């Protein structure tokens, strides 16, 4: 593994354990998780559950569009807390549920709406899973010699800033180890 990407910040215990537990319980009760599908040599399930709360329909990944749903008060409060910490304001929250080790997300960049240097906070709840980054190489490939790994814990906030998404890809790999559910909230901003 290489040195950490220069524009990534990990804030341990952004939420206390009790705050994280309460938020996790609310999300598991209230979030409208869906199993989405992409067209890739037929119809293929995206290997995680997803929910979207935002002021616009969220298009991504080979024709998948998550419909706009209002942001609940408890997430509005979290957005305000992130803003108060100096990480920007947001009008959308993508919630991914990794049910076990077979759920994952492939290497990708969050190239949000033409902003070459977006700030994208990401909050982990539940089980810790490796969050890997590697520099982009030609085409859709990554430079494996530049791989770096964080392991955000319950309540940790990881923030990608600057050129992180222009120069790096990130992912949550599969694992055969037994792991509990991990919920990840990724905060987005779009001028609407």
Set out the residue ranges of the language-model regions.
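Non-heme Fe(II) oxygenase metal-center motifs and adjacent flexible, charged/small-residue loops
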Residues: 1-192
